[in-house]
């Protein structure tokens, strides 16, 4: 691969700030890589959308990312990974990676009674259940769809008593099943970790698929000779609406306030 190709950005997308958990992992594990982050804030949350809507959104976003010159695309959104990855990855000329298989492979190394909290769309797809049982058919899996988590996080209500109450309600079935491992089936959910840890037994192991995905990214970049060995470019942030709100939330979650551009999909594709 040419130096120019290796210096291209990795494209990441999510419906909102959830994918920043993947971005943080990229900064930690692959600090030399340049990133283009897209948040489809005009159409969030994805977790209550239909499969057809998700497929349309994902197709538009990846088309735009590829036109923007990325060398790889990361679906930093479990709903997209669950419903669209297999359908779109052969359509584009860049590698497209999702969260679910890396997360499932890590989960089965941790425990035998695995709970998955996810958006309703991800839970209904059974993508994590299938991936976990494919990795190890002897484990047990329980999934809970959590429709209110993403809106609460995007509205910056992490410390609201109502959020704690909702978390308690969602976790109750998993506590009753005595899970030993909890998988974040949505990239937004690591922001809830203090609340979730306070509700679950201390012995429960938390699995963040973002960590597992970035390990896979590192391996793929090496295999494909796409690792950047030059100084990385500053991360570019693009949203489909509410740039100020996104920047303010990013300050809390990343520790710095990014410059955020706004584009309108699908208008940008014409």
Swiss-Prot record:
Source lineage: Bacteria, Bacillati, Cyanobacteriota, Cyanophyceae, Oscillatoriophycideae
Q: What's the source species for this entry?
A: Trichodesmium erythraeum (strain IMS101)
Q: Which reaction does it catalyse?
A: L-glutamate = D-glutamate
A GO BP entry: peptidoglycan biosynthetic process
The gene for this chain is murI
Annotated positions binding substrate: 14-15, 46-47, 78-79, 187-188
Protein's UniProt name: Glutamate racemase
- Pathway involvement? Cell wall biogenesis; peptidoglycan biosynthesis
| Enzyme class label | isomerase
InterPro entries with a match to the protein in the record: Asp/Glu/hydantoin_racemase (IPR015942), Asp/Glu_race (IPR001920), Asp/Glu_racemase_AS_2 (IPR033134), Glu_race (IPR004391)
Per UniProt, the keywords (alphabetical) are:
Cell shape, Cell wall biogenesis/degradation, Isomerase, Peptidoglycan synthesis
Its EC number(s): 5.1.1.3
Q: What does this protein do?
A: Provides the (R)-glutamate required for cell wall biosynthesis.
Q: Which family does it belong to?
A: Belongs to the aspartate/glutamate racemases family.
Q: Please give the Gene Ontology molecular function terms for this protein.
A: glutamate racemase activity
Q: Which NCBIfam families match?
A: glut_race
Q: Which residues form the active site?
A: 77, 186
